Amino acid sequence: MSYLLEFCHEHALSVDFAMFVLIWVVQLIVYPVFHKIDDRVFVSWHGSYCNRIGLFVLPLMLLQLIEAASASFFIDDMLAWLKAMGVLGAWIVTLVVSAPCHRKLSKDGMQTQVVNRLIRTNWLRTFLWTLVFVVSCLQY
């Protein structure tokens, strides 16, 4: 277990940078393109997108959560707690808002109002993961 915590802490800046870049690409490029995908192929395309993006997002999110929780416990300074709150906030928005939107799109197909909600609410995740990266830079 200590090896995992050490690994997460040593690579925190890289992981946080990866999430920072990924969330901005999703916000500015991927989600807006949802509006342009033909309705006849949207469900298939969206399912493929969710499966593939998950290969990148899930490991990064898990590493962030482990690192932020352990740093809050072992280091216990204001920046560690701020980063942990940012990571936790991003997880909450992901689970409570973004994931249900994606489930609806996967089930019902392209719905402009759902895509617009996804884009609008994703700004909060974009802010949170940007904050996490900035804090990580300050800690480095």
Annotate each predicted stretch with a short phrase.
Residues 136-140:
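Juxtamembrane boundary at the C-terminal end of a transmembrane helix
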Residues 100-127:
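Interfacial loop-to-transmembrane junctions
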Residues 12, 83, 87, 122-125:
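Residue-level recognition of transmembrane alpha-helices
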Residues 74-97:
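Short alpha-helical packing/oligomerization segments
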Residues 31, 35, 73-77, 99-103, ...:
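Transmembrane helix-loop junctions in multipass membrane proteins, especially transporters and channels
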Residues 57-71, 125-134:
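Core segments of transmembrane alpha-helices
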Residues 20-27, 90-98:
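Alpha-helical transmembrane segments
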Residues 3-63, 106-116:
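Interfacial loop at the N-terminal end of multi-pass membrane proteins
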